[in-house]
């Protein structure tokens, strides 16, 4: 039996059959009226979902958690740490892997230690920049060549990311990024970029690699709008590599890269 649980942006947990209807997520007030506001805890050998409020009662019990989640506090190790502290089994990455997977700086530092190829980068905390913006700008430009791409280190979905071709644009990009995160990553922009994705499933002893996906973008990077809105529509499109040249697709599966490059992508993914 699948028991749906929804975590709101204000960190409240809800459960109920109504959550199986995707339309209900368009109206949060309706969702909250129809679902049960609950907390998860361990009681007498069971993991229970108990209702909040005056009349507290056990709404359901669960055996294992499937964190099918996206965003801050749920895919960055916070939720995984909570589940682990309670003791409930859960699928997917553990706390450490979730943290490293979400923090771009941590990930790059680990890749560097393993001699994996990465783009030239630097990073800083917002207070370091705010204390002396000119000094930090000079440090960045001494280490990296323009154009650069500025990213909040711990966010996803391309939120807060900007490309800077000039020093003035770099300042604007940083000012934008620090409104989203206190930790900022700056990388040299890869020119004539062909962006590909590959997934691994399993662990270091036994894993499988996915097909390689090519990301199609009209910008210097795949933007939030392209990822989720797609030419004014909800989401981009996916086509095969044999699709029409005129198709305005966001992704191409499999990627249209040569066999040698495909093997290199698989090799690096396996090492990572």
Show where each model-derived region lies.
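Short, acidic Gly/Pro/Ser/Thr-rich loop/turn segments
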Residues: 12, 73-74, 157, 205-207, ...
